[in-house]
Amino acid sequence: MTMPQTFLLSLFFFLLSLPMQAQREGFSVSPVPDAVFQRMKGKSYKSGCTVPRSELRYVRVLHHTLEGKVKHGEIVCHRRIANDLLEIFQELFRARYPIAQIRLIDDFDADDTRSMEANNTSCFNFRRVKGSRSLSKHALGLAIDINPLFNPHVSQGGARVNPAAGRAYADRRKDFPHKLSASDLCVKLFKAHGFRWGGDWRHSKDYQHFEK
C-alpha cells in the first residue's frame, strides 16, 4: 500500500470514529462537583440528609428530546448505579429514544410534583415516600423517574394519579407515544441492569419509576 493510500485509509477511519468519539464525550461520571453541590444544598440535599456526599455521583448524558433535538442532561445518583445509568442512557441515545428533559430536581426547588409536571427525568432527592415516614429510594439516589408526565403513578384503582396532570395517560390500555411498557426499550434496558420497574408493582403502578 502506498503512502497516499495509507494516509487516506487512516483519515477515513479517523472521520468514521468522530461521531462515536463525540458521543462518548457527552457522557461522564464524576464525584459531585462543588458548583453542583451548591445547587443541591437545602433542596435535594436537605438538612439532615443521611447520604454522604461522597456516596453520590454526578452523571452527564446526551439525549434526544421529544422533538428530536440532542440535549445535555444531568443526573445525581448513588455511586452504586452510576455506571448502570451511564450505559443505559448511552444505549437510549444510540437508539434515538425520546426523553423530554433530564435536569436536576433542584431546578424545580426539589419539588417532585413540579418536576413531574414538567416531564422531567430525575433521580436523587432526599425525601420520604408520599404519605409515609419511610425514605424513598430517590432519597438514596437509587431510583429514577423517566418521562413522568406520560408515565404517572396510578393507585387506588385509578382514582389517584400522580402527577395529576398525567391523568390522560393513566389508562395503560390506550396506545400513545412515549408510554413505558414491558416491551419498551427503556424498560428492557433497566431490567437488564437489575432495576425493578414500578409498572410491575401489584397494588399500585408507578410507570415512570425504576429502582435498585
What does each model-identified segment do?
Residues 129-131, 135, 140-212:
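Catalytic cores and adjacent binding grooves of peptidoglycan-active enzymes
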Residues 23-69:
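N-terminal module-boundary/linker segments of secreted carbohydrate-active enzymes
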Residues 62-64, 127, 149:
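Structured loops at beta-to-helix junctions and adjacent beta-edge loops in soluble globular domains
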Residues 103-142, 151-153:
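Active-site-adjacent loop/helix surface patches within enzyme catalytic domains
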Residues 12-21:
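Hydrophobic h-region of N-terminal signal peptides that target proteins for export
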Residues 51-116:
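Active-site acidic/histidine clusters and adjacent loop/turn architecture
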Residues 17, 93, 195:
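Hydrophobic/aromatic-lined pockets within catalytic cores
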